[in-house]
Amino acid sequence: MNIKRITAVALLALTGVLSAAPLKIGWAINDISTDKPVELAGTFHWRHSKGLRDPLMATALAIDNGEDCVVFLSMDFISPPTFVANRVRKRVKREIPDLPPEKIIFHATHIHTGVSIGRTEKKLADEYGNYMVEQIFKSVKQAWESRQPGQIAYGYDLVVTAFNRRIVYFHDRKGGIGMSPRGKAVLHGRSDVPDFSHVEGGADPFANYLFTYDMDGKLTGAIINVGYTAQVSISDRYVSSDTWHDMRKLMAEHHPGVFILPQVAAAGEATFEQPYYKAAEKRRYRLIYGREPAYPGEFQRKQIAGRILTSFDRAHSWAQKEKFSDLPIKHVVRTLKLDPSVPSKVDYEAAKDGLKKIAELRKNPKTTERMRTSLNGRGNVCKRVVKSYENADKLPRVPMEFHVLRIGDVAFVSERFEYYFEFGQRIQARSPFIQTFTIQLAASNGPGGYLATERASANGGYGTRFLCPVSPKGGQEIVEAAVKELKALKAMDKPAKK
């Protein structure tokens, strides 16, 4: 039992004031790869892995000041599997009694070349799942048990890691079966056509960094928080951690022994792919590399990782001038219950029509194998839309694990969805903290899915209504809950009134 932590919590309850205390920091990283013939996650159609291109990793960072704590757990996966978080937390409760298991924030890099446990043959899936749990628990345990007195610094830089991938047209476009509701927007749509109007929204130019040091001021690691989902190699047939492998290689060359922990900021509609200027990009790569890529996305991965490294160095050059060894930490963990997405009559009819078309495609001998393997996923989406519409008055609110954390003048807010960039803007703009890191795809109590804004939902297309378990109103509920908690945490700086 941690008497110091219990005493500090009791004091906080009495005074309502947070106090600075010495930081302890620990890092760990472990491999969660497999070279077995698994199915890859990230697309409606199935992709059978041909092997391992580069390793998947689980990175943990523990920060503790004796009063409160956090363990960030970043995994190269499409989203945090519920069973992994549940099993790891059970082991933590049993084997690491001084670490509150709810203070672990599980989050994913959203790669599209990781393992699809649900599609992989059961025996192999069970084997990989057990291995993954063991390795992730090991990262948590090693990070927690390796904590030493340390310091942090923080900063940001501006860097292009992603673009908005929703192309808007002057007129409605036909939707896709079980994927895209009809509307004016198309994910990855063509921009070189007369009907092109604009790119729907922006993308996050900010890269947020939290740097860690030992007590001698030596850099030991950093959180890299960017509005970028690493899925450049989405067409690959090999297990890969995508851009984060390239970034780890660059860090090993330029900053040997320094850990990095990737976090994806709100970036539900972000992509590596430029919405236009594509011919110019191809020419650029031809002149830089003078050859064809060795594997899908090779050049984009290298370029994005290189830009992040340059950004990292720029931010660190000035952020390191102000290090902190004693800081207040407060970590709030709640379950939010969010407004569910209720399909419209138009989407209901489209989903019913989609089920009919899927049945026809199954019977058609000309249906390609690629399309055939996508029909189960598309059909499940259509069934969910139909069921939700027919039970609209009985739909429960959607639970979501929710973390709000402050470490000094830096704050973190997590949510479990592919959260559109504008929601993240709303949180950061209204936060009372100097820097606020948003973390998407970070939870353990249910699947993710997109969470689109009001504007995006009205425009339709992939990544909106069909694939959103929570409504735009629910997205704003996260914003309001985050701002409320952030203001409450900031208010703890002030002495309690007598």
Regions inferred by a protein language model and the residue ranges of each:
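N-terminal secretory signal peptides that target proteins for export/translocation
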Residues: 1-3
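A compositional/structural signature marking long, glycine- and acidic/polar-rich segments
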Residues: 5-7, 232
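Bacterial N-terminal signal peptides
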Residues: 7-17
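Conserved beta-alpha junction segments in alpha/beta enzyme cores
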Residues: 21-304, 309, 316, 320-498
